Swiss-Prot record:
Entry's Gene Ontology molecular function annotations: methionyl-tRNA formyltransferase activity
CDD domains: FMT_core_Met-tRNA-FMT_N (cd08646), Met_tRNA_FMT_C (cd08704)
Matches recorded under NCBIfam families: fmt
Function noted in UniProt: Attaches a formyl group to the free amino group of methionyl-tRNA(fMet). The formyl group appears to play a dual role in the initiator identity of N-formylmethionyl-tRNA by promoting its recognition by IF2 and preventing the misappropriation of this tRNA by the elongation apparatus.
Catalyzed chemical reaction(s): L-methionyl-tRNA(fMet) + (6R)-10-formyltetrahydrofolate = N-formyl-L-methionyl-tRNA(fMet) + (6S)-5,6,7,8-tetrahydrofolate + H(+)
Presence of the UniProt keyword Repressor in the record: no
Keywords noted in UniProt: Protein biosynthesis, Transferase
Protein's name in the database: Methionyl-tRNA formyltransferase
Gene name linked to the record: fmt
SUPFAM superfamilies tied to this protein: FMT C-terminal domain-like, Formyltransferase
The EC number(s) this enzyme carries: 2.1.2.9
Record: residues binding (6S)-5,6,7,8-tetrahydrofolate: 108-111
Family assignment from sequence similarity: Belongs to the Fmt family.
Superkingdom as given in the UniProt entry: Bacteria
Amino acid sequence: MLFWGTPSYAVPTLDALNDSGYEIVGVVSQPDRRRGRGNQQMASPVKQRAMDQGLRLFTPERIRDEGDIQAELKSLKADISVVVAFGQLLPSTVLNQPPLGCWNGHASLLPRWRGAGPIQWSLLSGDSVTGVGIMAMEEGLDTGPVLVQERVAIGLLENANQLSNRLSSITAKLFLESMPRIAAAGPGIESERWKQLEVIKQEEIEGDPTYARMLSKKDHILDWNQSAMDLHRRVMGLYPNAFSSWNNKRLKVQATEPLDEELKSKLSEEVRPLLGRWQDGEHEPGKILACESDLGLVVSTKTCPLLIRQGQLEGKSKALGEVLIQQLQATVGQGLGVGFNI
């Protein structure tokens, strides 16, 4: 098989297939990119794992335009391509190569959240459930028929990194479960294979297609005139990079809890005593209402207060509770989100 993937999300599937004895004749990943604090050229997590495992590696800048690499991949005569968060659309010349097809592990319940950021958009939109699907690939963006899906509930306090870790494990599991089915169906006429595999066309699945567009820097700004729940979803969905300002410095807000009585059962137990101490909407949004040494900063919003439990001030390390308060030298009545320009 050929394995296509780039971020850490794809590594568990590569490991699972390799450890289960499948012959991986090649791994295709994105080229090295500048990343991290030092902004240095770094290999993708999948490339690094492939090198560690001694697997043959390809890193096309744009596979659609690189006929030489396409020809080399074809010469490997892979039976199947497994794709997990590769990051480029595959052209028909690649999709049509393996006799058992190209199969993609997608981190949403298709047709909801087609595109590159389904995990972030599930959280930003307040979805209560999401999941993973294995689908046959077409030239369209995540439009192919679905072989299997698994649903999972999203926790109120679950951030994008935590949800990604859960879904990546499920992706690996579903591929291991699906490979024997795909192999048993064998090559042949597509319509007959789909019937044998009992794939479901996306237009037959309940719900209209939605698209997870690319996120911009402006999407990461916290607007304290929004509701506490909208702010919380932004913090969770864009973890760890949603930000506000503090004395003209960037303050990343990385863990929050909305102090809403209706959410009491879903909040951390130690946070629940804070409920009801401030009247909703009576304070200027963005103002600090309290500095709770063991918990963090209580900040006013358009609706109920929002507790900031973890943050990272520009030039500092991540901090929780009392340490965060000390780093900010925060006092009641000060405001966030004032006088800062991205």
